[in-house]
Amino acid sequence: MASLQDIRRRIDSTKKTSQITSAMQMVSSSKLIQIQKHTSGYLDYANHVEAIVAHLAAAHLLEHQNGSSIPFITQRPVKTTAILVITSDRGLVGGYNNQVLKRTDQIMREQKLTKENAVIFALGGKGSDYYAKRGFTIAFENRDITDVPKFWEVSDLVKEVTKQYAARKFDALELVFNHFINRLKNDVVNQQILPIRSENFQRDEKGNLTADKYKGQSSIYEFEPAPESLLKIVLPQFAQSLLYGAILDAKTAEHAASASAMRAATDNAKDLISTLELKYNRARQAAITTEITEITGGMAALQ
């Protein structure tokens, strides 16, 4: 049985840990508020840009039903697939990283991806280390971004992705990250980013664009430069904006997961302290009772 001194030492140690996790929870909550303000403004902008680009691209594709020369919206045979995995650099975020890595492994099994036909782009050390140890090619990695990442911090990564896709280093890009829902919940999602696809690109059963709202659109606008030249410039930038938006979303989910994990750790520490204090009081009471019994027994022996 642990001594009173050992129990008291554990209580003091757990209280200090509780203070640390409580402080970390407050810090994560503060970071969450900051990034939510930044992300909400960016997503409003990105949604409007997406609608405009999708409209322009669909109108262009309607006039090029037999194929477009723009690689970012043209389907091609997939020989190599790239996966952009967004994780954190450190732990203390609950199941945040495990969810992403588990979904990525699932995608690889479903698409029969191996070290020979898949490459990894990694944002965050956990994902990069995980797949490097398994022998996958890490085409590019980015670590130690700030709590509210600016575009310039991740520009090397997102530009490298679009550069390698345009150079046909890979033929499709899957993105796997945690999508922020609320403070208590996030959901791991995966989506194909390249080639760019949109629900606005309505097609018939043969894969031909059929959306009436796009027919003749290019004829009622005057473009300078020509639509095809414009799309060749705009689409890589649009793909980069999609990636940046996902990074902000994932970072928001990371702060929420960290706050939730630290809150759970603080609650567990408080429960443990209550249990230890009860154990301490019982042990102390038993020690006092034993001491009284010994004194009483000694007095009886003297009589």
Swiss-Prot record:
GO process annotations (BP): proton motive force-driven plasma membrane ATP synthesis
This protein's GO CC annotations: plasma membrane; proton-transporting ATP synthase complex
Localization: Cell membrane
Keywords, in A-Z order: ATP synthesis, Cell membrane, CF(1), Hydrogen ion transport, Ion transport, Membrane, Transport
Any GO molecular function: ATP binding
Main localization, broad class: membrane
Entries under Pfam families matching the protein: ATP-synt
CDD domains for the chain: F1-ATPase_gamma
InterPro entries (UniProt xref): ATP_synth_F1_ATPase_gsu (IPR035968), ATP_synth_F1_gsu (IPR000131)
Membrane topology according to the record: Peripheral membrane protein
Reported function: Produces ATP from ADP in the presence of a proton gradient across the membrane. The gamma chain is believed to be important in regulating ATPase activity and the flow of protons through the CF(0) complex.
Subunit: F-type ATPases have 2 components, CF(1) - the catalytic core - and CF(0) - the membrane proton channel. CF(1) has five subunits: alpha(3), beta(3), gamma(1), delta(1), epsilon(1). CF(0) has three main subunits: a, b and c.
Classification via NCBIfam families: ATPsyn_F1gamma
Family, as annotated: Belongs to the ATPase gamma chain family.
Name used for this protein in its record: ATP synthase gamma chain
Organism of this sequence: Oenococcus oeni (strain ATCC BAA-331 / PSU-1)
